[in-house]
A protein has these predicted regions:
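C-type cytochrome heme c attachment motif
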Residues: 86-93, 156-157
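Short pre-active-site segment immediately N-terminal to redox-active cysteine/selenocysteine motifs
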Residues: 77-79, 84-87
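Thiol/disulfide oxidoreductase modules built on the thioredoxin-like
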Residues: 126-133, 139-189
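N-terminal targeting signals for export/organelle localization
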Residues: 1-61, 190
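Structural microenvironment flanking redox-active thiols in thiol-disulfide oxidoreductases
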Residues: 92-130, 140-147
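Alpha/beta-hydrolase fold active-site loops
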Residues: 78-79, 109, 156
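Conserved hydrophobic packing residues within short motifs/helices of P-loop NTPase cores
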Residues: 81, 112-114, 159
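A short beta-strand-turn-helix
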Residues: 55-79
Length: 190
């Protein structure tokens, strides 16, 4: 059994790195949101969702504790968490889809992000181009990402928490299209 583990681990690592692709895979998608749209107050929403929007497009260096505290504060609301890095081309490809879905579900699903394996400056520069209507938790050592299960080095990854705050599913790799992402939101973010 142990003899199989090392080759399988190596094979999985190769596939995980390949998932990040090249610039030809995703091009350079346009943002669906301006900075003003992404950071506009979320009026009429629950206090928890309004608080998430107050931190929109910010990189929060609060560690695992800050992230877990936010998840606990959102109990009663399903949460979608996308793990990304500025150098990951498939992450860039998914950003417009995540922008759309976050706005579409802004009153019933919380969205958060985890930026890992990257510098804080690189994450902030990336967000100037593709702003998010929710915060990114800085995770340089992938400690937050470890809680998603699976390989910490897999980018992108999208984790789904149900309204009780339990992690119910993590999708590793890029979504095929926005419809596949939307289907997982409907299936798991309850």
């Amino acid at each position: 059994m142990r003899r199989l583990l090392a080759p399988l681990t190596l094979l999985f690592a190769v596939f995980a790195l390949a998932a990040c692709g090249s610039d030809d895979d995703a091009g350079n998608p346009e943002s669906n949101l301006t900075l003003e749209e992404a950071t506009a107050p979320l009026e009429g929403a629950s206090p928890q969702l309004a608080a998430v929007r107050e931190d929109a497009n910010q990189v929060l260096d609060e560690g695992v504790e800050g992230y877990e505290e936010r998840i606990a504060e959102l109990k009663g609301t399903p949460v979608v968490v996308n793990k990304w890095a500025s150098w990951c081309v498939p992450c860039r490809r998914e950003f417009p889809w995540l922008q759309n879905e976050a706005i579409e579900h802004e009153r019933d699903v919380a969205f958060l992000a985890v930026g890992g394996n990257d510098s804080e400056d690189a994450l902030e520069t990336f967000l100037e181009e593709l702003p998010l209507p929710y915060p990114t938790y800085y995770d340089p050592d992938l400690e937050i990402a470890e809680g998603f299960g699976g390989p910490r080095q897999a980018f992108p990854a999208t984790a789904f928490y149900d309204s009780s705050g339990e992690l119910v599913y993590t999708h590793f790799g890029v979504y095929e299209d926005e419809e596949a992402l939307a289907a997982d939101i409907e299936r798991y973010a309850r």
